[in-house]
């Protein structure tokens, strides 16, 4: 897995957790069928409760100090063991063949998850399994309780499907039937509480329009033009490593298991000392029999400070950055697909407040058209306002790709004597990505990686070369010597879309990309630039220290110095004379 927190002062308004996962299935198991009259809809998995009622609309509400008292029901409660059972059941090929259509229970609960499966439906809410008594029909219909699936099966396959569910100890109940008349009907306690025409639902409600007044970015805050002179390189370098969005988050990352399923190709931190932060999540496709060399790749791109200055630039470079990280890992950019997660301040009738989502989505659209790559999904929230505080305009781009494991490279520096080269992503006169130029360079870099000319690579962000080469070096305790003729302003300047590469000295001349030679890998652990030298200890202390008190990487306890204070002292110790098993592992399991 891959875990990362992004910091900006305005996220004090409301934090947001976003994530993405990838699934895989054999092509032969992918079927597209329609729901026919008489088909049965089965509710599979967890029970329904009051948790999650109003969650969909709640995600776009303004919150105040009183929200904690009145919004508790909007929060769903997960149930990981049930989720795992559903995954295991759906992985069975014979199960996939009898499912005609399926839907997960997200926003809107039963009314949406089941309501989307066919034009005509009759749903019996009394049959929906409940966590406890007392829920009325409306609550059952709109609850967003998690770990539930709705599947459409042929009547002759119902018993077979219920048998498969029973083998996984999953509750599965037929709750609805597909009807010929195109109406959505919900019944509760023998009465119809909803009876709506499908034609009416298909109108998507009343037509709405709004006026948008686009705010032009201020020249004064342009990150690309702000290139102040660097007076003290060492102080600036250490300050960069200590930045909240650069520093080590290893204490946080280690709270999550990066080895689930034994398919991880990249651990969150790489190198002999596990200190080089990886930029992509790479894992083998899980197979039940045999072995595979196919891997899935996922990366993200987003910078809150760039987006705060210009949502258009922020979204365009979010897409570009997510592509760059896949390319730096060895992926082929031409196979990438995106999914976007958006998060903006609360919209009102003020035309200027609509400027942020309008500009950001326009920038993301321009990037997709520029790369010729589509976004196949996304999710948004318009609730990022707390009283007078608004979150930064947020459009996070997730890029996904597939590759062969032998084509993937890791980001930590490999060997002293190798050269460091810099691929610059070309920009136009408006400081926007030159997509044609970038694609040309990324294509050449991909070929160079496959040819073994590049042994590690790192995509740059707002913090430039200094942060990237330092992180690359930490993993194997190597050093970096930067060319003295490199402009210090370039060393710390934002480099969205740029990539730093480690290349064996004898292969630098064979590169097909356009590059700048910026330095060399050393074995002394030092970071040097002209007359400036930073020891490995100084660099790591700056990088690790910022969040150590928040996300600890050491326990802070010295067992040898702990005073012994026996609460009870036994005169005699009694041992069972019969031999008993000695457990070596204790695994507690707590269903959520």
PLM regions with names:
Residues 1-592:
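Glycine/proline-enriched, intrinsically flexible loops and inter-domain linkers
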